[in-house]
Design a protein with these regions (language model features):
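Serine-hydrolase catalytic machinery in alpha/beta-hydrolase-like enzymes
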Residues: 6-109
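Conserved alpha/beta-hydrolase "nucleophile elbow" surrounding the catalytic nucleophile
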Residues: 35-37, 118-119, 168
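Short alpha-helix in the alpha/beta-hydrolase fold that links the catalytic acid
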Residues: 44-47, 175-185
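Gly/Ala-rich beta-loop-alpha elbow adjacent to hydrolase catalytic centers
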Residues: 117-122, 126
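A conserved short beta-strand
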Residues: 135-147
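Short beta-strand/loop motif that positions the catalytic acidic residue
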Residues: 164-167, 171
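C-terminal catalytic histidine-bearing segment of alpha/beta-hydrolase fold enzymes
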Residues: 180-218
Length: 218
């Protein structure tokens, strides 16, 4: 199943759109892929291109925070992290709304389901958006993700979201206890995480991608 890609600009940021055949008579999954810190949507696209998913509209946005040398992040570290995460929440909610509008302009009376996945800080982005974002979510996956400092506002409690959390015991960037803590926090907030501890390091590998395919297509 080959995917067609095009690059566009939404909310003043680069977004790569990818799709295969879409059947508007069935629910269409909108799958947002968040790259890691100091990275690019192209790096995430390399992995996303190996996800063979049915009836899925993929998008790979560029992070709003300039990390230098053409690389991007979702928020800044340090004392301003909470405010920066709040800006990320607004930015990402806009991107999801624009994806919905994009499909609604092409198809009549369609049902869309919002899904998120990400690696490292991108996994953290998916988890934060699940906790505090404005859109309802169908499924969420995090690989080597964690939770940053979050703004002091109420978390969502409207629905239970299935979450696949993959993390490695040999990860020297995001220690497994941080990833596990983040997923437990998701559970404490009413969501349904499946914790998958592996011997991997800080990476997104072929076995991870197979699990992601099974998760999003089930």
């Amino acid at each position: 199943m080959s995917l067609n890609y095009k690059t566009t600009e939404w909310d003043s940021k680069k977004v790569i759109l990818g799709e295969g055949p879409l059947n508007s008579e069935l629910p269409i999954n909108i799958l947002v892929g968040f790259h890691g810190a100091g990275s690019t949507p192209e790096n995430m696209l390399i992995h996303g291109n190996r996800l063979k998913l049915k009836n899925t509209f993929m998008l790979f946005p560029e992070g709003p925070v300039d990390a230098g040398e053409g690389r991007w992040s979702w928020w800044v570290d340090g004392p301003n992290q909470k405010d920066s995460v709040n800006d990320f929440l607004k930015f990402s909610s806009n991107i999801i709304s624009m994806a919905q509008d994009h499909l609604n302009n092409r198809f009549e009376n369609i049902e869309t389901r919002n899904c998120l996945w990400g690696f490292s800080q991108g996994g953290a982005a998916a988890l934060v958006l699940t906790l505090m974002g404005t859109h309802s979510l169908y499924k969420v996956a995090s690989v080597c993700g964690f939770l940053p400092e979050v703004p002091e506002q109420e978390t969502k409690s409207d629905s239970l979201v299935p979450i696949l959390g993959i993390f490695g015991t040999n990860d020297d960037v995001v220690p497994s206890f941080l990833a596990e803590h983040a997923l437990e926090e998701m559970k404490n907030n009413g969501h349904s995480p499946t914790l998958r501890e592996t011997p991997q390091g800080h990476e997104l590998n072929a076995e991870n991608l197979k699990e992601l395919c099974d998760f999003f297509d089930s």
